[in-house]
């Protein structure tokens, strides 16, 4: 492929600009032809067409620029009619800024500069024509550097491919170019003699501008057409209903029923549903609108299909209102209505049933579900206190306690690792597959499950070493008090009354603060989502049963009667409701929710891995292998429960 030389680009571009006229539209080159190499030999044919349609002398710089500005400033529209042309920029000013002369023939450098100024004019036509921006009081270098720095986050010395796409998006709208397959940006750059991967610089940008203007006036589509024309939506609606240009009353009734019930979707073909494109129109310094657009994934060589594309609000505004930045008026909304109806009919933005976006719980749901959860938590803690009454043997009590300790370690650490930490880090966010399907990435759950497997593996090694090598070894200093405190008789000596009362007060105060924190955590969890509330409640409940069993044993050993101990334990459990409603009130902000859940994850890991797991390792019993089996059963049950909740929590319906 041979590339244009600098002189041929400028002159051919200019005469192609001037040669386009309404009467010669049938002579537009096809998209394929426009992508082929151009040669200066075409100049004769261009001059012949030009002289037949424009009687004005073209050897005068001012007349050439005026003709060029009229054809660029007043492009043909889709209806094929040229309206009144009110130029917002004087040809003389354009020529002076480009460094041209009124009498001499235009030089190739002036032609390229004029093309660059026209690109700036196209991008900022609304501001220029509303007198918000005056092009006459700036020098040429200002417009050159303005285009080079179109995107503030990219290199200001080069026009990147993204910036080139932004410019081409404007030109496609402005000139309403061909809807056929477009010339790729890279091909356009090569045709303009731009070989650097960085893009055009200040020396080659004017040459690229001349090529863009020339091809656009010929009707050649440049870049990638990422949005359909406005007429597409109306055509889709009529085609979906009866494939004609008119609607009968019965078909209009069918349309209304579809929109009312949302029970069926009118699809023209079976295509993968696309995720809603979050493409907003971002304004950078200098009032440049950078178009971020998306396209239905079709074959590169095939025609573009928009039938199942989900357009964002910004894209619909871009299609119907030409990137309008002001508020949408009633007339604007009338124009956009076909697009909105088409999106509803095609169900393009509808997710699969099992992947619907989670809606934040309502105030009634948060307070209702969380109150039920704390009530169950309170009853569960009381269950822990009643278990001890049915076991007069200390050995049986210790075995039951270790079963629940293992369950608590599994649920607490499992909730922290499999649910809370991923939620804090945003790993629960939905992603989109290659074909546009929604799914929640579960890869992190398997990695975290491997982490839990490592914890369990080393626990087994240490426990087996303790059982096989030193079965009669003394207990370690980490042994928990709850596991070793014998169940005393109810008749405790009165001489220890003062010490017993102090110990009971310490236990009750600590238990009240602990339950308050549990209520706070449950409130934050249910404020986040119902699923988070369920998993957190299960973890806390499994922890509360052995915890309350231990506290109750300490209260009995301190000399309190059984009935008083149960009553005091119940009163301390009620502080969870205080923490709950405080948590619900302060965790309305998602940021506060995340911080509460962050501290909760740390607390769960500390309780399970620092406080309770060492107890399971060093506790002594007369039946060590039975305790070993019960501990592992509790651990496995806790981790398995939280793992299944992490996998299937999206399917939980409350």
From Swiss-Prot:
Protein localization: Membrane
Pfam families: EF-hand_Zip, Zip, ZIP4_domain
One Gene Ontology term of the molecular function aspect: zinc ion transmembrane transporter activity
Biological process, per Gene Ontology: intracellular monoatomic cation homeostasis; neural tube formation; neuron projection extension; zinc ion import across plasma membrane
InterPro entries named among the record's database cross-references: ZIP, ZIP4_12_EF-hand, ZIP4_N, ZIP_Transporter
Membrane keyword on record: yes
Annotated TM spans: 203-223, 370-390, 399-419, 449-469, 502-522, 564-584, 595-615, 627-647
Coiled-coil intervals, chain numbering: none
Annotated glycosylation sites: 59, 162
One cellular component term from this protein's GO annotations in UniProt: plasma membrane
Membrane topology of the entry: Multi-pass membrane protein
Catalytic activity as recorded in UniProt: Zn(2+)(in) = Zn(2+)(out)
Cytoplasmic topology ranges: 224-369, 420-448, 523-563, 616-626
Topological region Extracellular: 1-202, 391-398, 470-501, 585-594, 648-654
Span of the annotated motif XEXPHE-motif: 543-548
Keywords tagged on the record: Glycoprotein, Ion transport, Membrane, Transmembrane, Transmembrane helix, Transport, Zinc, Zinc transport
Homology family: Belongs to the ZIP transporter (TC 2.A.5) family.
Function statement: Uniporter that promotes Zn(2+) import from the extracellular space to the cytoplasm across the cell membrane. The transport activity is temperature dependent. May play a role in neurulation and neurite extension. May play a key role in maintaining intracellular zinc content at levels that reduce the inhibitory effects of rises in oxidative stress on spermatogonia and spermatozoa viability during spermatogenesis.
Protein name: Zinc transporter ZIP12
Protein source organism: Bos taurus
Gene: SLC39A12
